[in-house]
């Protein structure tokens, strides 16, 4: 399912317009991005939580040339599925 299909499905279930649903989804995603970018976590009970982590700098190797390269430290995005979401996927 892509973003437009998600918008269509939510609009059909809620009776809201597709434009309104699309705007709401865009706003929701923007709020999550801003919070996680600041280092906060976003917890949606029953669904999961979004957060950020840190990956330390490390040494890597170019598989083509065998040359050793330095990989800089980076922030990562993490999503942890909630129990209810996992159970729904596994149909427990």
Curated annotation (Swiss-Prot):
Entry-linked Pfam families: Bac_DNA_binding (PF00216)
Alphabetical GO biological process terms: chromosome condensation
One Gene Ontology MF term: DNA binding
Claim: Oxidoreductase is one of the keywords in the record: no
Presence of the UniProt keyword Chloroplast in the record: no
InterPro entries to which the protein is assigned, alphabetical: Hist_DNA-bd, Histone-like_DNA-bd_CS, IHF-like_DNA-bd_dom_sf
Gene3D superfamilies per the UniProt record, alphabetical: IHF-like DNA-binding proteins
CDD domains: HU
Keywords: DNA condensation, DNA-binding
Range of residues in the leader sequence: none
Subunit structure of this chain's protein: Heterodimer of an alpha and a beta chain.
Function: Histone-like DNA-binding protein which is capable of wrapping DNA to stabilize it, and thus to prevent its denaturation under extreme environmental conditions.
Record family assignment: Belongs to the bacterial histone-like protein family.
Record's protein name: DNA-binding protein HU-alpha
Organism: Burkholderia pseudomallei (strain K96243)
